[in-house]
């Protein structure tokens, strides 16, 4: 009986390692390709504030969240990103081809979401970054990319990535 349990445990650990490896490979394959001046390009939020990613990530890591109003998976990730923002985490979001500023603002208010948004109405930012999947999350610290992932990510997954960027 004990040997059977050990075998199941060993096989479970092997399966877990294979799944983790596959997830890491998929993240590497879908990782954004950043343009040369990505950190110093001025970007404007819906509130009219002009920001650069270098400035946003200078003092503390920033979570960049590429999302879309039409993205099915984003409906699960967006509330968790808003929760991080309400807890004081440094968050900037980019709305990918989700309409004009009024439409994006209306969508945000309808969903009860409050976080800063850069509207990428025509997809120029996402094209220059080679973002092919929504949602995509990028953690930056001091102007450099620390981690990227795409697809569904849990609150704790995002929190852990930000903690890692702050700590190391």
Predicted regions and their residues:
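Short acidic-hydrophobic, aromatic-tinged amphipathic segments that line or gate anion-handling sites
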Residues: 44, 116-120
